[in-house]
A protein has these predicted regions:
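Transmembrane-helix signature of polytopic, membrane-embedded enzymes
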Residues: 17-20, 107-138, 156-157, 178, ...
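Membrane-proximal stem/loop segments at transmembrane-domain junctions that anchor or position
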Residues: 264-376
């Protein structure tokens, strides 16, 4: 049966969009559950924690104890999912998956609006929307971000929709018709929502209104009187401005009441202003001074002496500002977030006045960093790439669909924008106005982001527009349309070349320093030595075999295949540090712990090693001492700060197979529990007792303690500290529930009977519990390698005993 003409015409018209959506869908499905995560990144913990409290009906109170307050829309977006589906990010990821496809479609429609309608059916320009959407669908940052609890996915979708509404207004038959005004109102709503997602968009509302004013003013012509022309231009310009204000105002009222003073959207701007000013003043980027200043206004556990040190050394104190001394005299609990915002702003402005030229210099450096590639950025999930932990497909996708696509698109976008305005200038006035709008959006971000501080994530909202113009340039090149460029376009071409040089050139071409000298600081780039994208990609790929060998070693040790482990170690495929640990573990397992200890270098040499390896070495040495029965020495080995910093609970569970605990008891947080526990946070003291909080999924291991008969398990649990109304604990073995404990609101010992485990085998007990999110103070307390890692707390245990 022949295909109906209407269906055929639809396919002919929309197949490029369908192809782009399919490519985006396939890439995101390939990434589902496969991000090389090592924990939460950037602001994920803050967003998720505040959303959980919001979903529980506690409003935005979580931010009362945080360093700043946050725009509400993204926490609200996450909170809806938590309210409906529980404390899990997976439903959020699914919604963000769909939003990613919406971004592709919006980019397609925006590109269609920027290409002359008469040209789409006849020449190369008809392919611009499809190519733009396809490139955006393959853009790796956006493909990754749908599984990240950051606002980018939602924010970019809203921004694209807002820009599209303005472009549709400009393409309306009449700029002052009812339909045109509806587009302006829609743009106002969308930019208002964007402002409630990220405060940076607030300023662009005024920029967009200015663009509307100029568009109407130029379109009106000089035949009308100045007053009539002004009135006709002001009315449309006021619509998005007023509507956006109406969207933002209710939240401003709520936030101002909740945070004890005027807060327009959030207080992140004040914090970032202080951070940027502090960086300029000190000549170096250090977060600690800014953080300590804010903590002195926030942390109720900080001593008055510490507060006086941090606040007394401020710029405001140096200038005898009475506001800072008044804050010093008040308890931190009485200082509101709005007052902290005022003091952060005042301190930032004070520092700027001290060294204004340094701030200009810092901002220019930030502008360059804004364009540079940062291969190891948190949101790229590439940290530790030299260990080989990244799958080759992820490494190659990052190189091709992130770095390479960006390096090519950036200069091509400038050329494409120039070509668009040159080729369409004769009879497409509104098209030129729309390209001006996009240019204003790009310039607005370039001017505002580096003023405070710039990270690669901040440039992602610009990429959809850059890809549209880059697609135009590529297709124009194929059609030999670059001949339209002339001498008047030389500045644009120079700018394109300069940006290409900045992002792609090796650092040695830019820096005046000798790379071999101590003063040389490597700069990120696309080409050149480390940390360039090309070299780091090679390092990530070439180190994969060593990582796989280390993983095979871990599996051999876990499965008691010591002979296979020795053969692997002798092959030289395992890196030297892991080889040392592996040999020491095998010596201990074969009954020669003294020989294992003798393999380690001296304490002085250990102190010079990588801190993560120091922690693992301490765990192995402590286990060997524990096998010798030297518990005091083992405790001292497990105790160093570096072990606490990394809390290597999971690593010890996977690599060690310790001897049975003395008296059949695991003492949580007592410095001898590593290797026996999984899914527990750092230990903490409480009087004479030590405790550990469990995560939602945890486990206990009693090595070789199976008796072939039922056994008794005793747990000392603190139900009083739980943040849950009805704390509970499910105990299971091999996935089968053994007991369900309803915990009382007190410290209590619970006893239960376990089914028989074969004689001499490990008794592994699984613990499952609902979790709660502690206050923001708990997240602030996570420092060192655990900074930014949200703790989802289950139950608090003192000890576990198996009889």
């Amino acid at each position: 049966m022949p295909m109906q003409p209407s269906i055929r015409s639809l396919l002919q018209r929309w197949w490029p969009l369908g192809l782009a959506l399919l490519a985006a869908c396939l890439l995101r499905l390939c990434l589902w559950g496969n991000l090389p995560r090592q924990g939460m990144v950037s602001d994920e913990a803050e967003y998720f924690a505040s959303a959980v409290w919001l979903a529980q009906g506690r409003g935005f109170s979580w931010h009362q104890e945080w360093l700043w307050t946050r725009a509400p829309l993204y926490p609200f977006f996450v909170a809806i999912h938590i309210r409906l589906f529980g404390i899990s990010p997976t439903p959020v990821y699914i919604s963000q998956f769909l939003l990613g496809l919406v971004q592709v479609a919006l980019t397609y429609f925006l590109a269609m609006a920027l290409v002359p309608a008469s040209a789409r059916a006849h020449d190369w320009r008809r392919w611009v929307p499809g190519l733009s959407a396809l490139l955006l669908g393959l853009l790796f940052p956006l493909a990754v971000y749908y599984q990240v609890l950051l606002s980018e996915t939602l924010y970019i979708a809203i921004i694209l929709a807002g820009l599209l509404a303005l472009v549709y207004w400009a393409n309306s038959p009449s700029l002052q018709s009812r339909r045109a005004y509806l587009f302006l109102a829609a743009a106002g709503i969308l930019f208002g929502l964007a402002s409630l997602t990220r405060t940076l968009a607030v300023g662009f509302v005024a920029v967009a209104a200015g663009w509307v004013f100029l568009t109407v003013w130029l379109h009106a012509g000089s035949a009308q009187s100045l007053k009539e022309r002004l009135w006709k231009s002001l009315l449309p310009a006021a619509i998005p401005l007023v509507v956006a204000g109406m969207v933002i105002a209710p939240w401003s009222v709520y936030a101002s009441r909740a945070y004890g003073g005027f807060v327009a959207v959030d207080t992140t701007g004040a914090f970032n202003l202080l951070l940027g000013a502090r960086t300029a003043y000190d000549g170096d980027r250090k977060d600690a001074p800014t953080r300590n200043f804010v903590l002195a206004l926030l942390n109720t556990h900080m001593s008055q002496k510490e507060r006086e040190v941090y606040l007394g050394s401020s710029c405001l104190a140096h200038h005898q500002d009475p506001r800072i001394f008044a804050a010093m005299e008040r308890p931190s609990a009485e200082i509101t977030q709005a007052q902290r915002q005022q003091l952060m702003t005042a301190e930032g402005l004070c520092l700027l006045q001290e060294r204004p030229l340094a701030f200009v210099q810092k901002s220019l450096a930030e502008l360059i960093d804004f364009f540079r590639i940062n291969y190891g950025g948190d949101e790229r999930f590439t940290n530790g790439f030299t260990t080989g932990r990244l799958h080759p497909s992820f490494v190659l996708a990052t190189f091709l669909f992130d770095d390479t696509l960006y390096v090519l698109a950036l200069p091509l976008a400038i050329i494409g924008w120039t070509l668009l305005r040159q080729l369409e200038k004769r009879d497409q006035t509104m098209l030129l106005a729309c390209s001006t709008l996009i240019a204003w959006w790009l310039l607005y971000n370039l001017l505002t982001a580096p003023l405070l501080f710039a990270i690669n994530r901040f440039r992602v909202p610009l990429l959809p527009m850059l890809l549209i113009f880059a697609s135009y340039a590529v297709l124009a090149l194929g059609a030999k349309a670059w001949g339209a460029l002339n001498r008047r376009h030389a500045p644009h071409l120079v700018l394109a070349g300069l940006l290409a040089f900045v992002v792609a050139a090796p650092a040695s071409w830019i820096s005046a320093y000798n790379p071999q000298s101590d003063s040389y600081r490597a700069q990120e780039s696309y080409f050149g030595p480390h940390p360039s994208s090309v070299v780091d990609t090679y390092l990530g790929l070439s180190s994969r075999d060593r990582y796989l060998a280390s993983e095979q070693l871990r599996l051999d040790l876990a499965n008691d295949q010591l002979e296979s482990a020795n053969i692997l170690l002798a092959s030289g495929r395992v890196d030297p540090n892991t080889t040392l640990l592996g040999r020491a573990i095998i010596e201990g397992r074969e009954g020669r712990p003294e020989a294992g200890l003798a393999l380690f270098p001296s304490e002085e040499q250990l102190a010079l090693a990588d801190r993560a390896w120091q922690a693992r070495a301490a765990v192995v040495r402590g286990d060997l001492l524990r096998r010798l029965g030297e518990e005091r020495a083992a405790k001292n080995t497990f105790t160093p700060r570096v072990v606490d910093d990394y809390n290597p609970v999971e690593w010890a569970w996977e690599w060690l197979k310790p001897s049975p605990p003395s008296d059949g008891r695991i003492d949580f947080g007592g410095n001898l529990d590593l290797g026996y526990i999984r899914g527990f946070y750092l230990g903490e003291g409480d009087g004479t007792d030590t405790w550990r909080w469990s995560a939602g999924e945890a486990a206990l291991r009693f090595p070789e303690m199976g008796t072939g008969a039922p056994q008794s398990l005793r747990l000392r649990i603190d139900g009083l500290s739980s943040g849950l109304h009805n704390p509970s604990l499910v105990v299971a073995i091999d996935g089968r529930q053994v007991a369900m404990l309803e915990l009382s609101r007190e410290v209590q010992v619970y006893e239960l009977e376990l089914p028989a485990t074969p004689t001499g085998e490990d008794v592994i007990i699984e613990l499952h519990s609902p979790v709660f999110v502690p206050s923001a103070a708990d997240l602030i307390a996570q420092q060192g390698p655990k900074v930014g890692q949200l703790r989802l707390l289950g139950v608090r245990l003192d000890w576990a005993e198996l009889e």
